[in-house]
């Protein structure tokens, strides 16, 4: 019994010594490794901060993506509504008896209004419209010019209405009422006084000359210039 008690008394200091020695050893080891531990801790801290920074933009991107998706859906729905409104308005315009809806095609492949006015005339106001059936030419500028087929065209060969112009042309007699100049052989002799000195006049027979003497004041030309 005494031996057991003595052995127990010896174990208590040994246990205490080992515990104290162990703690001292651990503290020494930690003291030696403090730099490494500190570097590891700092590295871990940096890694955690980086991870937090990475997570925050991802979360913002996810929120932005959800917002953009919702915005896109709203945009699509708005576009569909606008298309529906446009279709309804177009149908109403086509069904309405408006100017554009009542346009027709004429025989000349031109767009004509119901009032037989050309579509370009209604827009520009100055385009020329020719109506072949009525033989008239209308300009839509508050001016109407009528051309008739039966309109008499005045003869330019009349003596009293000849306008002297381009006097440098030797082949035309602009003053037919006066006596033909003998110095200009290119002018046709309109009177009966034929000159024998003019080699460019056409030779006439005696019958023709007699007829010309009978009709001295006729307006028909008596000769035509011809070059030999």
Curated annotation (Swiss-Prot):
TM region positions: 10-30
Topology in membrane: Single-pass membrane protein
Record carries keyword Transmembrane helix: yes
Residues with the Phosphotyrosine modification: 120, 140
Post-translational modification: Phosphorylated on Tyr-120 and Tyr-140. Phosphorylations activate the host ARP2-ARP3 complex and lead to actin nucleation.
Claim: Membrane is one of the keywords in the record: yes
Places the protein is found: Host cell membrane
Extracellular topological domain: 1-9
Superkingdom of the organism of origin: Viruses
Cytoplasmic topological intervals: 31-228
CC per GO annotation: host cell plasma membrane; membrane
Keyword tags: Host cell membrane, Host membrane, Host-virus interaction, Membrane, Phosphoprotein, Transmembrane, Transmembrane helix
Residue window of motif NPF-motif: 169-171, 184-186, 198-200
Family under the similarity heading: Belongs to the orthopoxvirus OPG164 protein family.
Primary role: Involved in the intracellular transport and egress of virions to the host cell surface with help of protein OPG056. Also participates in the formation of actin tails at the plasma membrane to allow efficient actin-based motility and thus cell to cell transmission of viral particles. Recruits host intersectin-1/ITSN1 and activates host CDC42 to drive ARP2/3-mediated actin polymerization.
UniProt subunit comment: Interacts with host NCK. Interacts with protein OPG161 (via C-terminus). Interacts with protein OPG056. Interacts (via C-terminus) with host kinesin light chain/KLC1. Interacts with host intersectin-1/ITSN1 and EPS15.
Entry protein name: Protein OPG164
Organism: Monkeypox virus
């Amino acid at each position: 019994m005494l031996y057991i008690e003595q052995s127990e008394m010896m174990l208590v200091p040994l246990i205490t010594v080992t515990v104290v020695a162990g703690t001292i050893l651990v503290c020494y080891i930690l003291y030696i490794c403090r730099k490494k531990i500190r570097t590891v801790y700092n590295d871990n801290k940096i890694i955690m901060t980086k991870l937090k920074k990475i997570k925050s933009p991802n979360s913002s991107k996810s929120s932005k993506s959800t917002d953009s998706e919702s915005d896109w859906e709203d945009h699509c729905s708005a576009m569909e509504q606008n298309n529906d409104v446009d279709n309804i308005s177009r149908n109403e315009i086509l069904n309405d008896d408006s100017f554009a809806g009542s346009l027709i095609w004429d025989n000349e492949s031109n767009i004509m209004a119901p009032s037989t006015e050309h579509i370009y005339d209604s827009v520009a106001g100055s385009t020329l419209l020719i109506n072949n059936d009525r033989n008239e030419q209308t300009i839509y500028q508050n001016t109407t010019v009528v051309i008739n087929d039966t309109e008499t065209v005045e003869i330019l060969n009349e003596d009293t209405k000849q306008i002297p112009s381009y006097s440098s042309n030797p082949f035309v007699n602009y003053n037919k009422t006066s006596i033909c100049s003998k110095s200009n052989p290119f002018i046709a002799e309109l009177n009966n006084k034929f000159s024998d000195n003019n080699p460019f006049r056409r030779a006439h027979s005696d019958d023709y000359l007699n007829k010309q003497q009978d009709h001295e004041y006729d307006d028909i030309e008596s000769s035509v210039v011809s070059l030999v």
